[in-house]
Amino acid sequence: MPKPEKVQKVEELYQKMLNANALIFTEFKGLSVADLTQLRGKIRPLNAEYRVVKNTLALLAIRKIYPDKDLEKFFVGPTAITYCYGDPFGVLKALVDYAKEHELLKFKGGIIEGEVYSADEVKELAKLPPKEVLLSQVVGAISAPLSSLVWSLKWPVNKLVWTLDAIAKEKEKISINQ
């Protein structure tokens, strides 16, 4: 029978995982406490937290959320989880930048909005701009052709109005001169 402390720890991990929209798994072997504190300080403003976990307990918790996914590969060796509660791409960028400075931080993979990604895929996702920028680019790409269409459709009508206005002014001049 499991100890109550372990059951409570699994429940805490489960709640954190459930509330996060992304989980990034890393290996931290060789990093000092000061290094990890510095990393936590970089991602905290991005609405994320970095926690070292016990593999067996984390695996029990994550299986409650993703029972059909093969996640055991992420829980081999020393493991830390970055819980992202906000924009995961900003956090990924911060983690990748930190890993460039501290080569001992290694990516194992991640789960972003329910999809499982390998370590290489996580690094590639870090190159994407934030969600708001992507959305504005999509809106811009959609609205530009629509604006052109509106102007194209309005142009003949505007031209007709200007022509009729010019004719009316010309007739007005003629009637004044008579």
Curated annotation (Swiss-Prot):
The keyword rRNA-binding applies. GO terms for biological process: translation. Gene3D superfamilies: 3.30.70.1730, 6.10.250.290. One of its GO terms (molecular function) is large ribosomal subunit rRNA binding. Pfam families: Ribosomal_L10. One of its GO terms (cellular component) is ribosome. Keywords: Ribonucleoprotein, Ribosomal protein, RNA-binding, rRNA-binding. CDD domains: Ribosomal_L10. The keyword Ribosomal protein applies. Belongs to the universal ribosomal protein uL10 family. Forms part of the ribosomal stalk, playing a central role in the interaction of the ribosome with GTP-bound translation factors. Part of the ribosomal stalk of the 50S ribosomal subunit. The N-terminus interacts with L11 and the large rRNA to form the base of the stalk. The C-terminus forms an elongated spine to which L12 dimers bind in a sequential fashion forming a multimeric L10(L12)X complex. This is Large ribosomal subunit protein uL10.
